Amino acid sequence: MVKILWVDDEVELLKPHVLFLQGKGYAVDTCNNGYDAIDMARATAYDLIILDEMMPGMTGLETLPLIKEQRPTTPVIMVTKSEEENIMDKAVGSKIADYIIKPVNPNQVLLSIK
């Protein structure tokens, strides 16, 4: 079973997406900040990490290299509300696999996973 970690400070809004992915056979863990994401990525070998770019405390862009330090081969999909290219250029430069712009469509997530 494919294991996914979804990191977003608006974790309550993810419930429908998590249920959708679980219905498709994915195991999905969630957390709401970069610090927990780093701990969870250290403890579990996820097949994919979906990471929100804008979070209070440690942003997605700050969290990304720390996760990549521990799990260099784990693909990361960045989720952003912003369509500013420079933000995604920074993320792409930090080796993200893909990015999604909010509001997130569950089918968009499914396509990115595949």
Task: Mark where each language-model region is.
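Two-component/phosphorelay signaling modules centered on CheY-like receiver
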Residues: 11-29
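Active-site beta3 strand of CheY-like receiver
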Residues: 45-50
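C-terminal output helix
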Residues: 86, 104-113
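Acidic catalytic/metal-coordinating carboxylates
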Residues: 32-36, 59-62
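Short amphipathic alpha-helix used as the core "switch/output" element in two-component signaling
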Residues: 39, 61-72
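Alpha4 helix (beta4-alpha4-beta5 surface) of REC/receiver domains from two-component response regulators
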Residues: 62, 83-98
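Receiver (REC) domain active-site loop signature in two-component systems and cognate sites
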Residues: 55
